[in-house]
Amino acid sequence: LAGPGGAGKTRLSIEVGLQVVEHWPDGVWFVDLAPLSEGEVVPMAIAGAVGAPSVPGNDAISDVVAHLAAHSALLVLANCEHLVEPISRLVGVLRERCSRLGVLATSRVPLGLIGEKLYRLDPLGADGVESDAVRLFMERSGLDGDVDLSDVVGLCRAIDGLPLAIELAATRSH
């Protein structure tokens, strides 16, 4: 999933994981990579999240591959944009060696993998009072129909229809 920050990629990836978990016998693992600043720690973060045992003499990539190769599961990697190159390399290895593993990655930019299926998540439309952005604002704000919806449309346009920004603005509207 690729799209601008605040478009809802992480939230959507969590929802996808919840919806498809029954199709993956060994479940779904979620790894948020946002806190990482170095590409070298990506395999260790994934190993910790999936419970890959550390084998003496192995590096973290080998531990992750050995563990995930034995599972039919979905690995969700969120917030990959700041470490695209190391994540792409690791996902490439996982795709080669872990035939029963699915990978769903979220990023502001595509990972650039051969065979990557790219789904773009764009901001919500804010083109009128019936738009998705206005509906989200009204739903999250709890305001009733007495609000001047043209102001809400203007606000939603000003924040580019980004769901996260709309939700934050809605919570401050009281």
List each language-model region with its residue ranges:
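Aliphatic-rich helical/repeat scaffold segments used for oligomerization and domain docking
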Residues: 1-174
